[in-house]
């Protein structure tokens, strides 16, 4: 159906705009509301639907989303910022905490670093990124701080070594 809006959007995406997008009228801000603020709130509403869907339809009790814990940790990197802007902070923190705890239960972090030896991106995805994200929403939490201090210690003792001058 050439008039089906969602179908046209998909077709536009996969066909490199071969037939153009359906018409779209940008919503206007109410009187007295700055356009940037209106659009920011609209954007946050869209993102809330995104995170709600992932938590409601994909996250399981163990804490993962089904994409493998390391890739799942990529998914939640934007959540602390959203929570700090007021998008369901308790819910997003609970979801992030469940994922971080699953990473540690699964043995993906040993002595502060990734258990597996891999390139720097994938080593970070093995849980250090989830621990870092946790600190934004759990400032001063003993377990979060302990996990990150183990990472700092590992970097200090095994990764970033002094040069011949002792620096």
Language-model features: locations:
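Glycan-recognition and catalytic cores of secretory/periplasmic carbohydrate-active enzymes
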Residues: 1-167
């Amino acid at each position: 159906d050439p008039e089906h809006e969602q179908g046209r959007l998909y077709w536009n995406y996969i066909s490199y705009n071969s037939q153009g997008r359906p018409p779209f009228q940008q919503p206007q801000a109410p009187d007295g509301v700055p356009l940037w603020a209106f659009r920011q709130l609209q954007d946050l509403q869209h993102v809330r639907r995104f995170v709600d869907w992932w938590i409601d339809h994909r996250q399981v009790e163990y804490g993962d989303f089904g994409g493998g814990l390391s890739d799942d940790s990529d998914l939640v990197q934007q959540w602390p910022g959203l929570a700090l802007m007021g998008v369901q902070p308790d819910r997003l923190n609970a979801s992030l905490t469940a994922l971080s705890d699953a990473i540690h239960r699964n043995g993906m972090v040993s002595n502060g670093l990734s258990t597996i030896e891999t390139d720097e991106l994938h080593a970070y995805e093995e849980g250090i990124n989830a621990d870092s994200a946790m600190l934004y929403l759990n400032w001063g939490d003993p377990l979060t701080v302990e996990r990150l201090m183990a990472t700092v210690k590992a970097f200090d003792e095994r990764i970033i070594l002094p040069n011949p001058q002792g620096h």
